[in-house]
A protein has these predicted regions:
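Low-complexity, glycine/serine/threonine/alanine-rich intrinsically disordered linker
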Residues: 30-77, 89-96, 100-105, 109-1021
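Short, aromatic/basic-rich helix-turn unit that serves as a nucleic-acid recognition element
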Residues: 80
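Low-complexity, charge- and small-residue-enriched intrinsically disordered regions
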Residues: 9-17, 403, 466
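N-terminal secretory signal peptides that target proteins for export/translocation
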Residues: 1-10
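Bacterial N-terminal signal peptides
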Residues: 13-27
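The substrate-binding groove and active-site-proximal loops of carbohydrate-active enzymes
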Residues: 83
């Protein structure tokens, strides 16, 4: 299968070479290291084998064989299959046998019991055997493991500047019992996986190598905004599909501004003439050819979204830009937003974007010096504002507004005759402020004198900061005719209305860019990187970049005759987080450039072939770029034999009639498809433990802490032989690099099984606050928390209980925290006095994920805690768990039902290790929020006899008496992730001893990470 695939994609010489590479590597035993001939047993091994095989195992079979033999043994344990020389996991199993017999749990009560003398003799022999078995050396034979799909993607990104996400092309990685995808035993190399890696290698090389002599084609345009900015708007009535909502063409202008580059390129101008037969009259059906000629039939300013913005208008045009309020998410249906997207949903809709390459979107924006819109309840008390007001009758607005002092002013609108609620638009110095208001409670006297005008009350409309002097004021809108006067009052400097406004104007909106495609009933858009804050009222340029292939694109045939077919979209939003009032975002212009290139040939080509034009390259010059590429991809110096082999691939392709570029492509594909590129090797020369080579250490360290390849500083230290010497320095350097986020995202997600949250379908009728955006933030909360603990080397007890927590605007609103962060999606450290919060167990996303979205599940929570936080994993449940006995159980509490279940045969043993951890966590409901419950529903007794009455007590107990177990659990999981396999018994024992040295310092988190890296499990092979 694989050879057939290679012959389809590569030239025959290259295909055969690549196939032979894979076969040769597969024959060595992937991930297992090289085999060595059987050796005679040592004296110690012979003693262990004799005692185990002649005494211990026969007795176990005699005592326990009824339950633990045959095809369906209890707990999956067969005593007749035990090895004579216990190693690693079997040592743990023997320790469990010993413990069960000491405690009298084996044999069970209903079976014949052991004679005390016989029992004592067996235990003595078992203890002696275990003492010797634990000291036996474990053969080390190096090993190899395939990179995970994400690691291979990161390798292509970091080493070749490859930006396109290709992970969907490779079968997903299997998951180990600890939840990790990088475990050597699950990193097999099936034909399907091998074919996928070769396919990716071929795709990357084919799409990266270009002809540098051919100039690239670049698309570049800008859409600028402003009231009446367009001197020559399109005369046609522009309509874009059903529910068309387009910005007036007079308020935006599109230009194609091609930037200067240090290399020649071809400007890719957008099409301006079109001929369509349907789709150009909105939702109406029509079949009639019509011709169009204007760039405004190619590029639209679309505002289609969910209607009904709650306060003010979703968007308005100002003299110098487009004003946007936060894009409030639309209601969700089955976890997805409804058809038309959020409110305030601005998009550039256009017919043409590049099909491949990196693009750049630049948003020139500022924070508006805005007014805060008010509700009818925002009336001022006498102490909150100056007693004197500036009152202007509606008929006198043309005379302007005279402000005597700088300050914050509240505007009340006097409109006693207004019927219902109507929109009023106020223009202050040209800026629009639109609000729907109702009738005021006081009328303006027809013969009012100045002293009476000062006492006029009206409907609160807005608060705004005004400078001393004259301001132009105008009013229009549906309710303008019923407005009799405007009443301005200056707020007292320290009053609550004034401080609330200062908080409002101090907050900066966040700009988000989204790219995708238009649908008949909405859009499919993906974000281009994280949102960026606009903190200043001065103009600034915010840059967003991505690879166009990573975003949704329409699949339509060329020259489709439907006006609406194949529309791409670039969405620009003021992002919505916690619903607080936010100054509007003012956008002056949006620029697009793609492919975005700063040099030619691009970095992806240069990493493969340098600056060379491959068609004119001399055969003698090929060796250098191939050697450089192999060294980069292998993360060590390529040997002369390896380079000779690559050169022979090139030469064979040339002899077969390939061009220079085709031959080089074949050789480069072999490099990327080589096991040395996508396998992590630790080459061992003997069964004895050996230190990692400097090159191996560089890769092992970077794929641990970056989930990607080592950079030049690491490789230079490896080359000089000083990496081991400067290891701690490099650990710190890697952990402050942005790439460490890849480690946190991968390790924490897999350790804590956050994929359960991805699969959770919460009951939205019961928990309407559980939006898609909240779920996304709750998914990041544990990652942010573990990252903070590592960054600041805090005690491991903070994993489970802490007076601090990480929150962003979305989660802070969900938890109803009194102190709100102001960093949008970014997590900030907050102190909390609510003991149910702080630590992993207080995080709603984790607790909710361990349920079904309708009710909490103490069994799932208990099993998860036992496995992940205290490293006391219960056995897997038996295959055929019996049902609850028949009877009327409708009036039973959950604990009563649980007791009925656990008292059945085959259930109690597992639940003894699960339920005591999970029952106190009943304090967290299905949405993950803390609720007070009677202690009878949350009380349990742990195996050590400790009585726990609620979740808070459980957190304290874990952080106190069980802090050493929590620290060990973190360290063990971290070590298994770091080395890509389970720890051997001796490795675990050594690591545990090293971890215990940190007890006096309360197990600092970064120190635990250092301990893992300095352990023999990590540093030797």
């Amino acid at each position: 299968v694989l050879l057939s695939f290679l012959l389809r994609r590569l030239s025959p010489p290259t295909a055969l070479v690549a196939f032979s590479i894979l076969l040769a590597f597969a024959e060595t035993g992937l991930g297992q290291g090289s085999e060595t001939p059987d050796k005679p047993l040592s004296a110690q091994e012979a003693d262990v084998a004799s005692v185990t095989g002649e005494v211990l195992i026969p007795k176990l079979i005699h005592w326990c064989g009824d339950c633990h033999q045959g095809e369906d043994p209890q707990s999956g344990i067969r005593v007749d299959r035990l090895g004579r020389i216990p190693r690693d996991r079997e040592i743990l199993l023997w320790e469990e046998f010993r413990e069960q017999i000491v405690q009298g749990k084996m044999p069970p009560e209903d079976a014949p019991q052991l004679d005390e003398q016989e029992k004592a003799e067996w235990l003595e022999k078992c203890e002696q055997m275990l003492h010797v078995a634990k000291s036996l050396p474990v053969p080390n034979r190096g090993g190899s493991r395939r990179m995970t799909v994400a690691q291979f993607q990161n390798t292509l990104h970091d080493l070749l500047d490859w930006q396109v996400d290709l992970t969907a092309r490779i079968p997903p990685d299997a998951i180990s019992k600890d939840g990790f995808t990088n475990h050597v035993e699950s990193m097999g190399m099936s034909p399907a996986v091998a074919e996928a890696y070769f396919d990716v290698a071929d795709h990357v090389v084919s799409n990266s190598l270009i002809d540098p002599s051919q100039p690239p084609a670049i698309q570049a345009f800008q859409m600028a905004f402003g009231r009446q900015i367009n001197p020559a708007p399109c005369p046609d009535a522009l309509v874009l599909g059903a529910n068309s909502l387009l910005l007036p063409n007079s308020d935006f202008v599109v230009t194609e501004n091609f930037p200067e580059k240090p290399f020649p390129y071809e400007p890719l101008r957008m099409q301006r003439t079109f001929r369509f037969i349907e789709g150009y009259v909105g939702n109406d059906t029509i079949r009639e050819w019509k011709e169009f000629e204007s760039i405004y039939h190619a590029v639209f300013a679309c505002m289609r979204g969910t209607p009904g913005y709650p306060v003010g208008l979703a968007y308005e045009s100002a003299p110098d830009g487009l004003l946007l309020r936060p894009a409030i998410p639309s209601p969700e249906i089955f976890g997805e937003s409804n058809t038309y997207g959020p409110m305030a949903n601005f998009k550039i809709s256009l017919r043409e974007l590049p099909s491949q390459g990196r693009f750049r979107v630049t948003v020139r924006a500022k924070k508006l010096e805005d007014a805060q819109l008010l509700s009818e309840s925002d009336l001022l008390s006498p102490s909150e504002a100056d007693p004197l007001s500036v009152v202007i009758a509606a008929a006198d607005l043309g005379n302007g507004l005279q402000i005597a002092d700088d300050g914050i002013y509240q505007l009340d609108v006097v409109a006693p005759s207004m019927e219902g609620r109507k929109e009023v638009r106020l223009l202050i110095d040209g800026l629009p402020f639109t609000h729907a208001i109702a009738a005021s409670t006081a009328a303006l006297p027809s013969d009012a004198a100045s002293d009476q005008l000062a006492k006029v009350a009206g409907t609160p409309m807005l608060r705004i900061r005004l400078s001393k002097g004259e301001h132009e004021v105008a009013i229009d809108g549906p309710g303008a005719a019923e407005v009799e006067a405007l009443c301005w009052r200056k707020l007292a400097p320290l009053s609550k209305p004034a401080t609330d406004f200062e908080a409002f104007e101090g907050y900066g909106p966040f700009v988000g860019v989204h790219v995708g495609l238009r649908r008949d009933c909405g859009s499919t858009l993906n974000p281009v990187g994280p949102a960026q804050r606009v903190a200043s009222t001065d103009w600034s340029d915010l840059v967003f970049e991505g690879a166009i292939e990573n975003f949704p694109s329409p699949d339509v045939e060329k020259n489709n005759v439907n006006y609406l077919a194949g529309i791409r979209e670039i969405g620009v939003r003021s992002e919505y987080y916690d619903g607080r009032p936010v100054p509007r975002l003012c956008i002056a212009n949006i620029s697009f450039e793609g492919p975005y290139l700063t040099q030619w040939p691009p970095p992806s080509h240069q990493q493969l072939a340098g600056n060379r034009t491959l068609e004119s390259i001399d055969q003698n010059e090929v060796r250098e770029p191939l050697g450089q590429l192999a060294t980069r991809m292998f993360r060590r110096p390529a040997t002369a034999d390896e380079i000779d082999h690559l050169l022979s691939v090139y030469q064979k392709a040339k002899l077969g009639g390939s061009t220079n570029q085709e031959a080089y492509r074949d050789a480069a594909t072999v490099v990327l498809a080589s096991p040395s590129s996508f396998f992590l090797h630790e080459a061992s020369l003997s069964d004895e433990a050996e230190p990692l080579s400097e090159w191996e250490l560089a890769s092992k360290l970077s794929y641990f802490l970056w989930n990607g390849p080592p950079d030049d500083p690491l490789l230079k230290l490896a080359e000089s032989g000083r990496l081991t010497e400067l290891l701690d320095q490099q650990i710190d350097r890697l952990l402050v690099d942005p790439r460490r986020e890849r480690f946190l995202q991968t390790f924490v997600r897999q350790w804590l099984q956050l994929e359960k949250l991805d699969l959770l379908a919460i009951d939205r009728k019961t928990y309407p606050e559980w939006t898609r955006d909240l779920k996304a933030s709750l998914r990041q909360e544990p990652i942010a928390w573990v990252g903070h603990l590592l960054d600041h080397n805090l005690p491991a007890s903070h994993l489970v209980d802490s007076p601090w927590m990480m929150a962003n605007e979305v989660t802070a609103a969900f938890y109803k925290l009194p102190d709100r962060p102001s960093g949008g999606p970014s997590f900030e450290l907050l102190r909390t006095d609510r003991e149910q919060l702080g630590g992993l167990l207080g995080q709603a996303g984790l607790m909710a994920a361990l349920g079904d979205g309708r009710q909490s599940n103490p069994i799932k929570r208990g099993a998860w805690l036992a496995r992940k936080l205290v490293d006391r994993p219960p056995e897997d449940p038996p295959p055929n768990v019996p049902k609850l006995p028949e009877g009327d159980i409708s009036k039973e509490t959950f604990l009563e039902k649980l007791n009925r279940h656990r008292n059945q045969p085959g259930c109690a043993a597992c639940h003894e290790k699960i339920d005591p951890w999970g029952i106190p966590l009943q304090n967290y409901n299905a949405s993950g929020c803390f609720v007070d419950l009677p202690s009878s529903e949350t009380t349990s007794q742990l195996a050590d006899g400790t009585k726990i009455t609620n979740a808070i007590e459980l957190k304290k107990h874990l952080a106190g008496q069980l802090a050493d177990q929590v620290a060990w659990s973190f360290a063990r999981h971290l070590a298994c992730y770091a080395i890509g396999r389970d720890l051997t018994y001796s490795e675990a024992a050594q690591l545990k001893t090293q971890v215990e040295t940190l007890a006096a310092a309360r197990y600092p988190m970064r120190s635990l990470l250092r301990t893992v890296i300095h352990s023999d499990a990590f540093m030797t092979k």
